[in-house]
Amino acid sequence: MQQEVVLALLAKEPSHGYQLRARLRQALGPVGEAMNAGQVYVVLTRLEKAGLVTTERPERPNPAKTAKDPADRKTYVLTPQGQQRVAEWLTEVSWPKPDLAEFHLKLVAAAAAGLADPLGIVDTQRRELLRRLREAQRAAMAEPDGSDAALLLEGIVLRLQADLRWLEACERSWTTRRSTS
Amino acid sequence: MTTAEPRLALATRGLTKTYGDGESLVRAVDAVDLEVARGETVAVMGPSGCGKSTLLHLVGGLDRPSSGEIDLAGRRIDRLGERALARLRRTDVGFVFQAFHLMDELTVVENVELPALLAGHSPRRARARAMALLDRVGVEHKAGSLPTALSGGQRQRVAVARALSNEPVLVLADEPTGNLDSAATLDVLRLFEELHESGQTLVIVTHDERIAATADRLITMRDGAFVDETRLTGGTSGRLGALAGFES
């Protein structure tokens, strides 16, 4: 998980680790299910070392009220450098990179060496993408209207659809090449 | 006591539809063998002109095959006369189309009750059934509206309610999400899922990978024939995080 994500979640108000975790769960829904409970704390520790976050402890801990995990007793606060990093991160342009070249070259190499049928490779890939699409679509269908996670799932679904359309183009192209060679 | 319900809602053997002859002969549907179990949702995908819509028209009795057999719930329908075929289309099959095909001069509830009235049910019974169906698809509050006052997703819900009017053996859908945006598509997919859970048999031809991915079985069609079949059932892999680029 990117440090900036946790940093930005902390920008709302000083928070305990478990509160940050709850906000992540809320925003990610089923996408965040595989998230390890300790991950947020690992990131927070790194952020603290980097001087982007400081911690405050309650002056007189009340054993009845405090959480079991000692890390949960701390309140995390953004430092001025942390604030600045969040502001920078929000204006940065970044976008996940799709890696199409490797798959494309796999088809080209398989056909050139006569190692495998490119159409067979396309088929296998298509089934895998359809399985992933099924999973994302089912998760999207289970979300209530207007949930944050539903919007994220829609993004996953649309990207998978785009990949599937490209596979269709691959199939058409390799079918034509096979029949004309 | 009649015999047990047949296991298959639909079966075709060697189903073929050709147009033209000689040099210009086109095999729109070419010797298709298809079996659809009761309660199954089957999606048929393929490029434009692959014959998937023609296939749907043949099994729904909207068009006649050149050769081959069609069994609907254990009954041969490929040799039915015109009148019997018209009755079959009204009572045994429900259609859902891309462009909804609702009658714009009739209200929503009048559209939905029409098939029941045509099948000879009393107006009172047809209306009650239509209202129950509109309730089921979540647009009962629009019963008195004209279809043009509804969103695309709502219109498709009404079309689905109409398709269910006579409790058909089979619901056939032709590009049901073709005219819908992303949110309305999700809505229709949820509705199909509900139908599936209630045991309705569905055959959907579509370009939309989202429908294909939610079906029990996906058939790929090319040049009038089935070229691939994939069963997509299975549990979750828990990889949604990775799919979102959210590495855990």
Which sequence ranges carry the predicted segments?
Chain B
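ABC-family P-loop ATPase nucleotide-binding domain
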Residues: 1-18, 231-248
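ABC family nucleotide-binding domain
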Residues: 7-215, 221-226
